[in-house]
């Protein structure tokens, strides 16, 4: 471990294997708090490299509680959080709509980072249990098309880093790991990041981790596809990464203001999402969710974003998507 420390403190990049060794030790509680703080700040100051991020993610995945991985195509839609936008839970709403149109979504989530309520806070407000066993969650994925995997249940080693992260009060590598350590290991993912500077590093990391197809997005300060600003995309497809930009017109939609997407407490967000999934949501909410679902559909090979948006809008306005929420709550 001293060799790894010395490389870090000299400003040198770690290999994937070295990063994996380091983070395996971290999540086993083998570093002191001062050592961990020094490691995280050293990496932050020079910038974390994709090989280092991938090594950390592999350490978390290798030590995660197991999930029975399906042999059918499935995906995740998730953001890093930390964008400060305090928006409604767009990725969570998008997961329900995606399931309604036939996609399989194993959504990895945690408590709030950037909004007043994260995906897990919102699910709890709906009465959806967060403590499902891996086998029960897999059954929900099979039968309802959607399951939620609560990060602390699968990644208990995070607890060793929590005190230092709270004391540092700054973003570190741990802030970008969440979307990369889904224990179901989906082959497809739509991942939002809090800074455009993370687009290529995270796309490169997804390539190293072996994702089949994925899109990393940022839009005007938000960690998702948004309609208030152009969405910057780094798309991974069969080992190649392409950068491009999307605007509302690419989805056949009109722009909205960022203030139109503001959320609130878990209970407020629960009501906003319930209205949306019953086909009675605000235009900005409905269309923002539809745009995210449209890009997720593209990752499944349905390339026409405007047609995809129409499919998603039809599912939302049918009012039937709320049945997915009720079905998950009933299985508590």
Curated annotation (Swiss-Prot):
One of its GO terms (biological process) is L-tryptophan biosynthetic process. Binds 2 magnesium ions per monomer. Pathway: Amino-acid biosynthesis; L-tryptophan biosynthesis; L-tryptophan from chorismate: step 2/5. It is an enzyme of class 2 (transferase). SUPFAM superfamilies: Nucleoside phosphorylase/phosphoribosyltransferase catalytic domain, Nucleoside phosphorylase/phosphoribosyltransferase N-terminal domain. Its cofactor is Mg(2+). 5-phospho-alpha-D-ribose 1-diphosphate binds at residues 79, 82-83, 87, 89-92, 107-115, 119. Mg(2+) 1 binds at residues 91, 224. Mg(2+) 2 binds at residues 223-224. Pfam families: Glycos_trans_3N (PF02885), Glycos_transf_3 (PF00591). Its EC number is 2.4.2.18. Anthranilate 2 binds at residue 165. GO terms for cellular component: cytosol. Anthranilate 1 binds at residues 79, 110. Keywords: Amino-acid biosynthesis, Aromatic amino acid biosynthesis, Glycosyltransferase, Magnesium, Metal-binding, Transferase, Tryptophan biosynthesis. InterPro entries: Anthranilate_Pribosyl_Tfrase, Glycosyl_Trfase_fam3, Glycosyl_Trfase_fam3_N_dom, Glycosyl_Trfase_fam3_N_dom_sf, Nuc_phospho_transferase. GO terms for molecular function: anthranilate phosphoribosyltransferase activity; magnesium ion binding. Belongs to the anthranilate phosphoribosyltransferase family. Catalyzes the transfer of the phosphoribosyl group of 5-phosphorylribose-1-pyrophosphate (PRPP) to anthranilate to yield N-(5'-phosphoribosyl)-anthranilate (PRA). Homodimer. This is Anthranilate phosphoribosyltransferase. It comes from Proteus mirabilis (strain HI4320). The gene is trpD.
